[in-house]
């Protein structure tokens, strides 16, 4: 099915955005490592329910522009991107739904722009308010010498070198080890004390199981698209 996309200028960059349907807008915000395509199964049901579906590739993802400066990827910048999309479409307000890393984006869009957001829904990640300790410092205190992926991602160039070596394999490992079945396997191993703890010098994909087959929710065609 041919989808309707628009490259929308917003907040100084251009964001690839799927726009379909009529009615009150619903913005869907994807997580990592994903794109608008993660919400493909929600498009038609929401259109039939009478909503305008808006699904951007968040800056840095998919066909949206990718600023080189790391500071360009703050929650403040990304929330401004979304509000700019509403402005471009001449929409005063919208519902917003986020999954994974898209959930904090959704929470903070509603927090920073309460008059523009009708409702907010977060999947996978609960609301986490800022506190006196910066998030990275807090994670460093919690994990110390233990591997944690967000801390690993702070090392500029490390994750890129590992994950871009074979992008399709990286995505296959990530998707198949972080879905409900993959997480259950890790929890079961942890409960039996058979889960090897990674130290902070480990690589992201280290210890992930190579799947023999893709899960029912992910086809080879889907994987190729991502």
Model-found features: residue ranges?
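Active-site donor-binding loop signature of nucleotide-sugar glycosyltransferases
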Residues: 10, 58, 125
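Conserved HGGG/HGGXW glycine-rich cap/lid loop of the alpha/beta-hydrolase fold
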Residues: 18-65, 99
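A generic local structural motif
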Residues: 12-16, 39-41, 84, 106-108
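Generic alpha-helical hydrophobic packing signal
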Residues: 3, 14, 43, 53-55, ...
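Alpha/beta-hydrolase fold catalytic core
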Residues: 1-26, 48-51, 91-92
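Flexible "cap/lid" subdomain of the alpha/beta-hydrolase fold that forms the substrate-access gate
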Residues: 61-65, 71-97, 101-225
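Short gly/ser/thr-rich secondary-structure transition/capping motifs
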Residues: 8-11, 34, 103
């Amino acid at each position: 099915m041919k989808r309707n996309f628009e490259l929308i200028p917003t907040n100084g960059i251009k964001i690839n955005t799927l726009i379909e349907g009529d009615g009150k807008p619903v913005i869907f915000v994807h997580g990592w490592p994903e794109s608008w395509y993660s919400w493909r199964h929600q498009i038609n049901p929401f259109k039939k329910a009478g909503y305008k579906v808006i699904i951007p590739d968040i800056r840095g993802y998919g066909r949206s522009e990718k600023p080189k400066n790391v500071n360009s990827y703050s929650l403040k910048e990304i929330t401004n991107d979304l509000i700019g999309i509403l402005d471009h479409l001449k929409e005063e307000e919208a519902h917003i739904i986020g999954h994974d890393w898209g959930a904090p984006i959704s929470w903070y869009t509603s927090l920073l722009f309460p008059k523009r957001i009708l409702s907010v829904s977060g999947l996978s990640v609960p609301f986490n308010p800022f506190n006196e300790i910066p998030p990275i410092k807090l994670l460093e205190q919690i994990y110390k010498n233990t591997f944690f992926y967000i801390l690993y991602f702070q090392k500029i160039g490390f994750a890129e070198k590992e994950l871009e070596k074979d992008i399709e394999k990286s995505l296959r490992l990530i998707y198949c080890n972080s879905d409900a079945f993959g997480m259950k396997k890790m929890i079961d191993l942890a409960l039996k004390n058979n889960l090897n703890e990674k130290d902070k010098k480990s690589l992201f994909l280290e210890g992930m199981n190579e799947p023999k087959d893709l899960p029912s929710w992910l086809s080879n065609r889907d994987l190729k698209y991502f």
